[in-house]
Design a protein with these regions (language model features):
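Residues forming the flavin
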Residues: 1-184
Length: 184
């Protein structure tokens, strides 16, 4: 609550965002990250343990290009329209309009086509997630909502392999949590 989206980039020519708020949490708006599941099938290209890192970097490079080095933003209504135009969705869905508002961002931003950042399968999953959230929080998927991205660092892009009892190839080591690639 009362938060902002900030540029959290750590590499030249790439852009990642993250949400933050001051301790008082008294800003005018709130923000939330809508996360989609990404599996190796979404990004396997080189068949190396670092494929997830390469994919993350590709998304961040796409975001950097989309916003010309600034945080790329787009109204949800336009995002949906672009997905329909590209055949990713059959029809647009966005909730009843809420009162328009300014994006709660810190740093420079630029309006852009966010559908160019992720592959079609992830854009579709994102839109489905927004629709599902709107069933729980009315207005969540309003066409007036500002999207910005990409928040690509919610979990490690490298997953440590585990066996059937969740142990790594080193006896007694049980990888878990975000750092091991097992968020959620």
């Amino acid at each position: 609550p009362g938060g902002y989206v900030v540029n959290a980039s750590s590499e030249e020519g790439r852009l990642a965002v993250n949400g933050m708020s001051y301790s008082d949490r008294d800003g005018d708006c709130a923000n939330s990250a809508v996360i989609v599941s990404v599996s190796p099938e979404d990004y396997k290209t080189r068949d190396t343990p670092l494929d997830g890192v390469f994919f993350q970097r590709e998304l961040e490079q796409n975001a950097y290009r989309a916003g010309n080095g600034k945080i790329p933003i787009q109204k949800y209504r336009e995002f949906q329209k672009n997905l329909v135009d590209r055949g990713v969705l059959e029809k647009a869905f966005y909730a009843e309009a809420i009162e328009p508002f300014s994006p709660a961002l810190m740093g420079q931003y630029e309006q852009a086509d966010l559908t160019d950042i992720m592959p079609a399968s992830l854009n579709r999953a994102f839109a489905e997630g927004m629709e599902e959230m709107n069933r729980k929080i009315r207005g969540f998927a309003s066409g007036e909502v500002w999207l910005c991205g990409v928040e690509s660092r919610t979990s490690s892009p490298i997953r440590i392999d585990r066996d059937d009892v969740l142990q790594s190839n080193i006896e007694g080591i049980y990888p878990c949590g975000e750092g091991a690639g097992y968020a959620g």
